[in-house]
């Protein structure tokens, strides 16, 4: 990570604080509008109150090519309920008011429709810290690179085991805040066994930068959170939290507290 990346990052202080506590950050994802807008916003503030360090606010999209079945079902329900991009910004504002840190996770098309600079402006105004863009590569991100600089937002790009050394280095150099390491190939979703490719991918990023690395796509338990927290800077959980929310807010709260305990036991056997 360059000096510029470190100084400009809105999430940098959070990762510094977690490092000082010798633990990984817990990063939780929920889609806006599931099961309805108000409940989804309440659920996201529950994540904050239950120990989630960063909340990924999902923008439902009609063609979610990288999402597993759990998240696809939730986003379809949200879209059927009429969720809008503006609702995601409302969620960001609520998370910020609750003392949390929010990043938006969205496919690129909704941002283009909204207007790239306008979206960055409104996200920053809502208290957002940055944007995760799973289907946008830095080579095609000139508008977003400019808008994120203009409005002081972190930009979180994805790397995968299939990333070539050149692509990985370019992606890491363009990222700010953290890099999202997809620990399994293909779509996301909770799995019983976390991919063995994840430690290797984190090591590849660490070989070219000291930017924080978040690992996602598979975590569902306290034990898995602890396992990933031993080598990653952030443990990303999505599908398991969406499933828990389907069982109600108490279930979501319980799982989040378990995961928060998991990232804090990274040095335990």
From Swiss-Prot:
GO molecular function: tryptophan synthase activity
Enzyme class: lyase
Keyword Amino-acid biosynthesis on entry: yes
Pfam assignment, any one: Trp_syntA
UniProt keyword terms in alphabetical order: Amino-acid biosynthesis, Aromatic amino acid biosynthesis, Lyase, Tryptophan biosynthesis
Family the UniProt entry places it in: Belongs to the TrpA family.
Quaternary structure (record): Tetramer of two alpha and two beta chains.
The protein's name: Tryptophan synthase alpha chain
């Amino acid at each position: 990570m360059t000096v510029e990346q470190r100084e400009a990052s809105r999430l940098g202080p959070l990762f510094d604080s977690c490092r000082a506590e010798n633990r990984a950050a817990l990063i939780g994802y929920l889609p806006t509008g599931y099961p309805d807008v108000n409940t989804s916003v309440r659920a996201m503030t529950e994540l904050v109150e239950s120990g989630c360090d960063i909340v990924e606010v999902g923008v439902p999209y009609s063609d979610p090519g990288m999402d597993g079945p759990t998240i696809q079902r939730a986003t379809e329900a949200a879209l059927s309920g009429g969720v809008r991009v503006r609702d995601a910004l409302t969620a960001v504002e609520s998370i910020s008011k609750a003392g949390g840190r929010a990043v938006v996770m969205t496919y690129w098309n909704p941002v283009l429709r909204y207007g790239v600079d306008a979206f960055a402006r409104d996200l920053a105004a809502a208290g957002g810290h940055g944007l995760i863009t799973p289907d946008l590569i830095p080579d095609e991100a000139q508008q977003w690179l400019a808008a994120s600089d203009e409005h002081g937002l972190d930009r979180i790009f994805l790397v995968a085991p299939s990333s070539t050394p050149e692509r990985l280095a370019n992606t890491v150099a363009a990222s700010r805040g953290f890099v999202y390491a997809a620990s399994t190939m293909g779509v996301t979703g909770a799995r019983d066994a976390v991919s063995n490719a994840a430690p290797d991918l984190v090591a590849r990023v660490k070989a070219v930068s000291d930017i924080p690395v978040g690992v996602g796509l598979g975590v569902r338990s306290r034990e898995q959170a602890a396992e990933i927290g031993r080598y990653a800077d952030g443990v990303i959980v999505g599908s398991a939290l969406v499933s828990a929310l389907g069982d109600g807010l108490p279930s979501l709260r319980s799982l989040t507290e378990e995961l928060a305990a998991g990232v804090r036991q990274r040095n335990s056997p």
